[in-house]
């Protein structure tokens, strides 16, 4: 997190910060640290991925729901019942950090630009360390690691971002 203060300064007047990276790369930890410095609200894609096969759906939800210009929000995913949960309303005026696999995509960048200044960040970490972190956080992820990694791989070439870390 050597660059945290530099990035926080760049994000201070941003309406939207998008933080992407593969599972276990440190997105949630970085977002929390950045939010402490900027006061931005943090939205976690983990709260609304629709099941283990839902990466593409969640990516669309960022642009259409989370970054909606007048009625932003998202539908939580209930991981215990594998069903949609309650709707969460967001304040359209509040600056936010959106973090998770798939946060940076063409549609989310376009939607974020309509809100004002956007800063995009991608975190990198080697696969072995990422897997160890992810499974330490949630041992049940072991059964789904390959399914999720395949969706990450299928995203193909990544868009350029303002900051590449790792």
What do the predicted segments below correspond to?
Residues 136-166:
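Small-molecule kinase domains that catalyze NTP-dependent phosphoryl transfer to phosphate-bearing small molecules
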Residues 22:
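P-loop (Walker A) phosphate-binding loop of NTP-binding proteins
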Residues 27:
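Conserved lysine of the Walker
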Residues 30:
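Hydrophobic positions on the alpha1 helix immediately C-terminal to the Walker A/P-loop
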Residues 19:
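Hydrophobic anchor at the beta1->P-loop junction of P-loop NTPases
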Residues 41, 47-100:
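Conserved nucleotide-sensing/catalytic segment adjacent to the nucleotide-binding pocket
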């Amino acid at each position: 997190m050597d660059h945290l203060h530099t990035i926080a300064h760049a994000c201070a007047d941003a309406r939207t910060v998008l933080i992407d990276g593969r599972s276990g790369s440190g997105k949630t930890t970085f977002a929390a640290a950045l939010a402490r410095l900027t006061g931005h609200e943090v939205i976690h894609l983990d709260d609304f991925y629709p099941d283990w096969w839902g990466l593409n759906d969640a990516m669309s939800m960022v642009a259409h729901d989370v970054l909606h210009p007048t009625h932003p929000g998202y539908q939580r995913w209930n991981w215990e019942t594998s069903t949609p949960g309650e709707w969460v309303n967001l304040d359209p005026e509040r600056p936010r950090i959106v973090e998770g696999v798939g946060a940076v995509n063409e549609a989310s960048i376009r939607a974020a630009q309509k809100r004002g200044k956007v800063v995009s960040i991608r975190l990198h970490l080697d696969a072995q360390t990422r897997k160890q972190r992810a499974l330490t956080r949630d041992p049940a992820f072991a059964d789904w690691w390959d399914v999720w990694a395949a969706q990450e791989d299928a995203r193909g070439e990544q868009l350029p971002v303002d900051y590449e870390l790792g």
